């Protein structure tokens, strides 16, 4: 292992300690809490704190004159750049872990997240975006930094369980950002949130100090323990180039990029697309769509205990994952049909929840969430299940999976955004009495991109081909739990 001054400092007085479950869970909890803070900070920006230029929110703050606000394409380009930055940060995680150790990579990523504290007080919009990009790079790294902890401290059964709970923190954070803008707390409270957007971002940013201080005090240098270094020296030498040359890396990119589209695009695009599909330019059903998204995210809390249970058993994974993702996308299509043909046609019930069609719409969102969120734990556990898997390899692999997955996600975002709002097209001049063709085209793309994951799964190898196929099981007694 090549040394540098940071690694030299990190390796001083390293005393090997037992890799106990309690320590592992503590480190895991600190990192997933940091990830939830990132999701909250990031989500509030698009959930409602953005406001409108010349009126409220951070757009009203930076552009008090609405005529000076950046156009749609510029705003989209900014978002694309930030997402690409997150992808680059994800790819760099594996390299940083090798160069400065896991503990100091975590601390560095949390330091990046502290830029979220000062971003709201930037004197310019450009500064605000740059500071939030640095913050986002640090926040994105958290989901990858979980994996070496899980790989080192937990056995195979414990990994299967914890992989079910790790995904909880994205929907929890996102639900928190949606609640103030779902009509639950009233219009005055919504206005207060938007008017005090800097304080909201400041409070969330300050929460980052909890995992930062916690990890400085409690974080361990498990990857620098002599026994781990000895194991790593006996293993194949890995680099980013090694993984770039492997076909599996690109199959994982297809799978994770497509899955990200399936779970993030409904949150990003449902409101504008749903409104345009029914010709509603006033956002009359905005609150109801927010509640639909809350139901979708709430599916995360049921998914791991239903859909996600497969990780605990000796059953093949690939076809199961593909089927569940397809089913989740199917529920999204059904929910859209119900909204466009029934819920969105009934303006009398736009603000109430007493009609049956609304509840069907909401529960389809829940079923969609159970499938798409519930399957995440099964997917996250897959790299741990392949023969030859080790913490060193998993750290590199997850960095690339998320980094390249975010890149694929960004490409899908650019294409969908350009179809949804083509440059030079004035949406205000579209005929709202008819279905908006641009919005419909964007929606069809979302469905296609969400289903591409099946291609990645078909190309990947089954991690345990000796496991039984679920469809060939004839009784529960044939299903065996994974041994430690």
Swiss-Prot record:
The primary location reported for this protein is membrane
> What is the recorded membrane topology of this protein?
Multi-pass membrane protein
Respond yes or no to whether keyword Amino-acid biosynthesis is given for this record. Answer: no
Q: Does the keyword Membrane apply?
A: yes
Supply one GO CC term from the record: plasma membrane
Pfam families xrefs? MFS_Mycoplasma
Q: Per its record, what are the GO molecular function terms?
A: carboxylic acid transmembrane transporter activity
Keywords from the named record: Cell membrane, Membrane, Transmembrane, Transmembrane helix
Residue ranges annotated as transmembrane are: 19-39, 78-98, 111-131, 134-154, 165-185, 199-219, 249-269, 289-309, 321-341, 360-380, 398-418, 440-460
List the InterPro entries.
Answer: Hexose_phos_transporter (IPR054938), MFS_Mycoplasma (IPR011699), MFS_trans_sf (IPR036259)
User: Where is the protein localized?
Assistant: Cell membrane
Q: Mind telling me which NCBIfam families this protein's record contains?
A: MMSYN1_0881
**Name of this protein:** Uncharacterized protein mhp246
**Organism for this UniProt entry:** Mesomycoplasma hyopneumoniae (strain 232) (Mycoplasma hyopneumoniae)
């Amino acid at each position: 292992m090549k040394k540098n001054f940071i690694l030299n400092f990190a390796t001083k007085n390293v005393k090997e300690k037992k890799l106990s479950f309690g320590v592992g869970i503590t480190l895991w909890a600190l990192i997933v809490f940091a990830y939830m803070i990132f999701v909250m900070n990031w989500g509030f920006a698009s959930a409602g704190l953005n406001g409108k230029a010349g009126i409220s929110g951070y757009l009203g703050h930076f552009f008090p004159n609405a005529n000076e606000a950046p156009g749609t394409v510029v705003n989209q380009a900014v978002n694309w750049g930030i997402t690409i930055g997150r992808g680059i940060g994800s790819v760099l995680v594996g390299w940083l872990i090798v160069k400065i150790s896991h503990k100091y990579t975590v601390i560095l990523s949390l330091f990046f997240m502290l830029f979220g504290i000062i971003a709201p007080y930037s004197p310019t919009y450009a500064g605000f975006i740059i500071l939030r990009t640095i913050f986002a790079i640090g926040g994105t790294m958290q989901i990858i930094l979980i994996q070496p902890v899980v790989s080192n401290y937990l056995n195979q059964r414990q990994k299967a369980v914890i992989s079910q709970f790790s995904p909880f923190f994205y929907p929890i954070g996102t639900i928190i950002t949606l609640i103030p803008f779902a009509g639950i707390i009233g219009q005055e409270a919504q206005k207060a949130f938007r008017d005090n957007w800097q304080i909201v971002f400041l409070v969330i940013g300050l929460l980052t100090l909890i995992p930062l201080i916690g990890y400085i005090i409690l974080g361990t240098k498990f990857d620098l323990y002599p026994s781990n270094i000895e194991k790593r020296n006996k293993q194949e030498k890995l680099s980013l180039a090694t993984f770039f040359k492997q076909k599996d890396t690109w199959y994982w990119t297809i799978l994770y990029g497509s899955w990200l589209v399936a779970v993030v695009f409904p949150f990003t695009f449902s409101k504008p697309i749903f409104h345009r599909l029914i010709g509603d330019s006033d956002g009359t059903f905005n609150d109801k769509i927010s509640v639909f998204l809350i139901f979708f995210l709430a599916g995360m809390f049921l998914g791991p205990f239903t859909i996600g249970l497969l990780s605990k058993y000796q059953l093949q994974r690939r076809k199961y994952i593909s089927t569940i993702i397809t089913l989740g996308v199917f529920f999204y299509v059904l929910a859209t049909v119900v909204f466009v043909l029934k819920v969105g046609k009934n303006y009398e019930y736009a603000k109430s929840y007493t009609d049956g069609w609304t509840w069907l719409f909401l529960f389809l969102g829940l079923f969609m969430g159970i499938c798409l969120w519930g399957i995440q734990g099964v997917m996250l556990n897959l790299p741990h299940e392949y023969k030859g898997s080790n913490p060193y390899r998993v750290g590199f692999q997850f960095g690339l999976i998320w980094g390249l997955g975010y890149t694929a996600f960004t490409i899908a975002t650019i294409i969908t955004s350009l179809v949804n709002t083509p440059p030079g097209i004035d949406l205000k001049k579209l005929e709202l009495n008819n279905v908006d063709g641009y919005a419909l085209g964007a929606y069809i793309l979302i469905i296609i991109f969400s289903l591409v994951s099946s291609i990645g799964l078909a190309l990947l190898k089954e991690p345990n081909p000796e496991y039984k196929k679920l469809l060939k099981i004839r009784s529960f007694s044939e299903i065996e739990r994974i041994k430690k």
